[in-house]
Design a protein with these regions (language model features):
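Active-site-adjacent segment of SDR/Rossmann-fold oxidoreductases
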Residues: 35-36, 52, 73-83
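Active-site loop immediately N-terminal to the catalytic Tyr-X3-Lys motif
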Residues: 54-58
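Substrate-binding pocket helix/loop in short-chain dehydrogenase/reductase
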Residues: 5-6, 10-15
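Active-site helix of classical SDR
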Residues: 29, 63
Length: 140
């Protein structure tokens, strides 16, 4: 995660965010697509910021949006093999990453979901055959 206005963003931070949040998931999907059995699935967690960007988090939001766009595209490619590419977009989750940002300081945020709650919701979606997990799917 990284926080701060666009004027505070340096190239190294931008590169790190895209490497971790966009390039890595895309490469993992590329490398695993041939290994996933027909009817299988691939899950990525982009988070709510992929489709609902937040002020002061432009680079982080953009990196997550890039992964979301790739997952959406590849989901169409793999549909004929009945492989579900699920991009989960949970709201703020208490992973501790906000307090260990690679740049900037996190604003005060409301208490987020627990990682266990997010994982349970994703597993339930897989079992139920859900293909879309927007932020609303994580509402209690």
């Amino acid at each position: 995660m990284a926080f701060g206005g666009i004027g505070e963003l340096d190239d190294a931070t931008l590169a790190k965010l895209f490497a971790v949040n966009a390039t890595a998931p895309i490469v993992m999907l590329r490398e695993s697509a041939a290994l996933i059995a027909d009817g299988g699935f691939f899950v990525n967690i982009s988070g709510v910021v992929a489709t609902q960007p937040v002020a002061g988090m432009a680079a982080y939001s953009a990196s997550k949006a890039a992964a979301w766009a790739a997952m959406s595209s590849v989901a169409r490619e793999l549909r004929r093999r009945q492989i579900d590419v699920i991009d989960a977009q949970p709201p703020h989750t208490e992973t501790g990453l906000a307090s260990r940002a690679i740049a900037g300081v996190a604003p005060k945020m409301p208490v987020g979901l627990t990682p266990d709650a997010v994982a349970a919701r994703i597993v339930a979606a897989i079992v139920a055959g859900e293909r879309d997990l927007p932020v609303e799917a994580f509402a209690s």
